[in-house]
Amino acid sequence: MSLGLVGRKVGMTRIFTDDGDSIPVTVVEVGDNRVTQIKTDETDGYTAVQVTFGARRASRVTKPLAGHLAKAGVEAGEIIREFRIDAAKAAELQTGGSLSVDLFEVGQKIDVQGVTIGKGYAGTIKRYHFASGRATHGNSRSHNVPGSIGMAQDPGRVFPGKRMTGHLGDVTRTVQNLEIAKIDAERKLLLVKGAIPGSKNGKVIVTPAVKAKAKA
């Protein structure tokens, strides 16, 4: 896994390219990723960097975590995440330092992970795009029901994984191969072409794309 950043989804807007095209972009604030720990093969069995993002009141931090952050000399954040890196990259970082937008460049392909918007309890039409039943012609009470969910005596049960009504959204999802359209280094913003998971102010993880294709 490559070194990435934790950020906050600010919202969406549109920008104009040099060719005059208007493209939709998502604004992601990725400033002040503070390094809380650097893990190595010798001490932890693997190499990684641990970072925190955002701000949290001291009264809302547990004593073990407060001690961990105090040892690193950083302020408490809303979220802590790890990025697996190689030993050479880990040697360039130091506890108490910070990471910012200079990890990325305009035109680079990235993967963005976030928690999707929760929709609550949803029916099969909204959840799985089932077709509605007939409005008339003998259909009186089965307009938006899923229909048959299995056979009768044999096998006499509903198979696991059957698509039915249930909770929709509020799950972790990753959108791959998004393009960085613009970088505002002064305000520590990434403008990502297209949409990313989550609601406004939701936390996201931005990493270099794992499936990026080399330019011809």
From Swiss-Prot:
- A single Pfam family it belongs to is Ribosomal_L3
- PTM N5-methylglutamine: list the residues: 153
Xref: PROSITE patterns: RIBOSOMAL_L3
Q: Name one GO cellular component term.
A: cytosolic large ribosomal subunit
Question: Which keywords does UniProt give here?
Answer: Methylation, Ribonucleoprotein, Ribosomal protein, RNA-binding, rRNA-binding
**Cross-referenced InterPro entries:** Ribosomal_uL3, Ribosomal_uL3_bac/org-type, Ribosomal_uL3_CS, Transl_B-barrel_sf
Keyword field contains Ribosomal protein: yes
Which GO molecular function annotation, any one, does this entry have? structural constituent of ribosome
Q: Which SUPFAM superfamilies match?
A: Translation proteins
Which parts of this chain are annotated as the region Disordered?
134-153
Provide the GO biological process annotations: translation
Describe PTMs of this protein.
Methylated by PrmB.
Task: Cite the record's note on assembly.
Answer: Part of the 50S ribosomal subunit. Forms a cluster with proteins L14 and L19.
Which PANTHER family does the record associate with it?
Answer: 50S RIBOSOMAL PROTEIN L3 (PTHR11229), LARGE RIBOSOMAL SUBUNIT PROTEIN UL3C (PTHR11229:SF16)
Main function: One of the primary rRNA binding proteins, it binds directly near the 3'-end of the 23S rRNA, where it nucleates assembly of the 50S subunit.
Q: Which family does it belong to?
A: Belongs to the universal ribosomal protein uL3 family.
Q: What is this protein called?
A: Large ribosomal subunit protein uL3
Q: Which gene encodes it?
A: rplC
